[in-house]
A protein has these predicted regions:
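P-loop (Walker A) phosphate-binding loop of NTP-binding proteins
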Residues: 4-5
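Conserved glycine(s) of the Walker
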Residues: 8-9
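Hydrophobic positions on the alpha1 helix immediately C-terminal to the Walker A/P-loop
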Residues: 12-13
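Conserved substrate/cofactor phosphate-moiety recognition/catalytic segment
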Residues: 17-109
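Short glycine-/polar-rich loops that comprise or flank the Walker A/P-loop
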Residues: 21-23, 111, 135-140
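Acidic, metal-coordinating catalytic cores used for nucleic-acid/nucleotide bond scission
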Residues: 116-126, 146
């Protein structure tokens, strides 16, 4: 897991490591950009199998999307030939986040090595580390940060409150327990 504030350099760190160590790499920002460019996400490229019912229900049943007011939009998704298709108004960061969560869950089930980026804004990330540890994974958490928030690469995203993180949402003790 590469964790840290937006713009701290998590994606840059990836470029310095061999792909063989990373396994399947999941970055919600890259996922969102790919969806916006093509209108779909190719699920097969992540080495997982799913059904139309399974993947679509991950979105229509997402409490996160429901809380954000995207329940109806989630019902507009379609899945065919391993591709999840998005309408133009749906390919946003919330949907990319749900898709990354879905893929992570599938990778855990088949015990495939994977790496992902996160801002660690939700206790569910600690639960994910605990679940992975119980499944026999060896967890590695790399926290990437800068000395000065003024030099972060993408401060405008935080300013727009797309990924605002509340203070003390996760404690270092919670993270430590999940990684040891």
């Amino acid at each position: 897991m590469f964790a840290g504030p937006n713009g701290s350099g998590k994606s840059v760190l990836k470029s310095y490591l061999p792909e063989s160590l990373l396994g399947v790499y999941l970055n919600p920002d890259e996922m969102e950009a790919g969806i916006k460019k093509s209108g779909y996400a190719d699920i097969h490229r992540f080495g997982i199998q799913t059904t139309q019912e399974e993947i679509l229900s991950a979105f229509t049943g997402s409490k996160f999307l429901q809380e954000k007011g995207f329940f109806d939009a989630a019902r507009s998704l379609s899945f065919e030939d391993g591709r999840l298709f998005f309408t133009s108004d749906v390919g946003n960061s919330y949907f990319a986040s749900v898709l990354v969560d879905f893929i992570r869950g599938k990778l855990l089930k088949v015990r495939q090595t994977f790496t992902f980026e996160t801002v660690m804004s939700h206790p569910g990330k600690v639960a994910l580390l605990q679940q992975a540890q119980q499944a026999g994974y060896r967890n590695y958490l790399y926290y990437v940060a800068t000395d000065d928030p003024e030099i972060c690469g993408k401060p405008s995203r935080v300013e727009r409150a797309r990924c605002a993180i509340r203070k003390n949402h996760l404690t270092l003790l919670q993270i430590s327990r999940a990684t040891h």
